[in-house]
């Protein structure tokens, strides 16, 4: 996927870029695989905001994605490559030999008309799904299960890719996009290849309104709030934060403080922690 850049005809088009969708199939989504979606807008079941800066945005239909790839030993043909408003990756509509249709994440290099399969004996080709124990060392994978038969949970974002670096006993070692190196059961399945739409990270929205279309509300600095609203607020004019270190809106230390649970079951599976900026 390439990007199209706008000329600065207006302040809103200055530095604005959009995805070039010329390679996508211009069709409505498969009706049997779509459903209406209630958007939580950052609220929990009591209506209390638990995630700030969310709300509004364009109305969307949810596309049901097959993260499990549990239709084994049956080939499927790629019918369309489509835009999905619910994620930055593209999705591909595949049709199996028995006529069933499913959406999958579109891997880079998979074209309309290609054949894919989920099998323990599948060849090492883009789009095929295999258990990690059956993959060769060095292969690039995405849509990785954390627990067998649960469905892919890791490496699903646009352009994301992990690498299989070692096999030992009941576990394989994966290098994840974050830089973390961890062990995963060799019975877990994954899909070969890199998630498509790799230029998504380089998109420039260009104006605030485009963030609102995506359902993102403005983020206000704590230092410009009143003291009742934020630990950094209050004072006459521009003031320091008034604490030894920055604080969250709820008074906890921020910036550089570890928030991971000290005793977590997966600590023994993580060989190298992710890169922390």
Curated annotation (Swiss-Prot):
Keywords: Chloroplast, Plastid, Ribonucleoprotein, Ribosomal protein. The keyword Chloroplast applies. It is found in: Plastid, Chloroplast. SUPFAM superfamilies: Nucleic acid-binding proteins (SSF50249), Translation proteins SH3-like domain (SSF50104). Residues 228-254 are annotated as: Disordered. GO terms for biological process: mitochondrial translation. GO terms for cellular component: chloroplast; mitochondrial large ribosomal subunit. Part of the 50S ribosomal subunit. Belongs to the universal ribosomal protein uL2 family. This is Large ribosomal subunit protein uL2c. It comes from Ostreococcus tauri. The lineage of its organism: Eukaryota, Viridiplantae, Chlorophyta, Mamiellophyceae, Mamiellales.
